[in-house]
Structures are given as structure tokens and as C-alpha cells.
């Protein structure tokens, strides 16, 4: 008798366009996912639709990854997709230091925190990490100073 271990892919930003599309594709291909989003109604609705587990948390909050770890428990994780992000368009002359710090915290600090939190689980299960970036890499936008 073969014993199969069910592993999950964790998707942060699961209720956005990229995150929800990725979750649906993974489910269609037979994978299981753990969805992470900041809006309880949206993430629980998507989790119900996909028959998936989920965590509600905001990546800008201190120790947000502890909630994800708690909800996952001993679940083996073999993939992490960071689909969180925003696009804040304004001319450079109107930007403030706080705009850059907010973007830095959202796009870099929160990604490194969740990677560190899941690193042992991912390593043990030969997992991988995907960090989604912005469309602005391919095509610039006016007033994309942040």
C-alpha cells in the first residue's frame, strides 16, 4: 500500500487577479492550496469555492506569518506564491517618504518574512517560491515613481 502525503501551495494575495487565477489553475491540476488574504469575506468565499483552507491576515501587520503557520499546523508545504502588491501612481514631486516605506514594507519586507517563516517546511518538502512583480517591468507607466 502506498501512502501519499498531501502537500499544499500557499498563496498570499489569493483574492487578487493573479492570486485567484493561480489558485484556480492549481486546483484544476490536482494541487491543494492554502489561501491567504486580508479580507475575511473575500478569502473565505474563494476558499469555499475551491474547497481550500485559508488564513485571513494583513501582511503589513507585525507577525502576520505566525497566523499562517498556526493555521497550517503540520501541513507539508511545497510551494509559496507571493501575489501581494499594489501600484501607487503619482508624480515624484508629490511622493512622500511614507509612500516609499509603505511600498517597501508591502513588496519586500512582508515577502521575506513569510519566506523565512515557511523556509524549513519548504526545504523539507523540496518546495519552491514564486514572487510576482509588477507589469511595470515590461511596460512603464507615467507617474510610476513609487
What are these regions (language model features)?
Residues 128-146:
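Catalytic loop of short-chain dehydrogenase/reductase
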Residues 115-116:
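A short, exposed helix-loop element centered on a Lys and neighboring polar residues
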Residues 15, 20-23:
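N-terminal Rossmann NAD(P)H-binding glycine-rich loop of SDR-like oxidoreductase domains
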Residues 91-92, 99-104:
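Substrate-binding pocket helix/loop in short-chain dehydrogenase/reductase
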Residues 49-63:
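Rossmann-fold cofactor-recognition segment
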Residues 31-43:
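Conserved glycine-rich Rossmann-like NAD(P)H-binding loop of the short-chain dehydrogenase/reductase
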Residues 81-89:
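Conserved NAD(P)H cofactor-binding loop of Rossmann-fold oxidoreductase domains
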Amino acid at each position: 500500500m502506498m501512502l501519499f502525503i498531501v502537500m499544499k501551495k500557499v498563496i498570499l494575495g489569493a483574492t487578487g487577479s493573479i492570486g485567484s487565477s493561480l489558485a484556480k489553475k492549481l486546483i484544476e491540476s490536482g494541487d491543494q492550496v492554502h489561501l491567504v488574504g486580508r479580507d475575511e469575506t473575500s478569502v473565505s468565499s474563494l476558499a469555499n469555492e475551491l474547497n481550500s483552507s485559508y488564513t485571513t491576515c494583513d501582511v503589513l501587520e507585525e507577525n502576520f506569518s505566525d497566523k499562517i503557520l498556526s493555521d497550517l499546523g503540520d501541513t507539508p508545504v511545497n510551494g509559496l506564491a507571493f501575489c501581494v502588491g499594489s501600484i501607487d501612481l503619482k508624480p515624484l514631486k508629490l511622493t512622500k517618504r511614507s509612500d516609499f516605506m509603505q511600498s517597501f514594507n508591502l513588496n519586500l519586507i512582508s515577502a521575506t518574512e513569510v519566506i523565512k517563516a515557511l523556509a524549513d517546511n519548504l526545504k523539507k518538502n523540496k518546495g519552491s517560491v514564486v514572487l510576482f512583480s509588477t507589469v511595470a517591468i515590461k511596460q512603464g507607466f507615467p507617474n510610476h515613481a513609487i
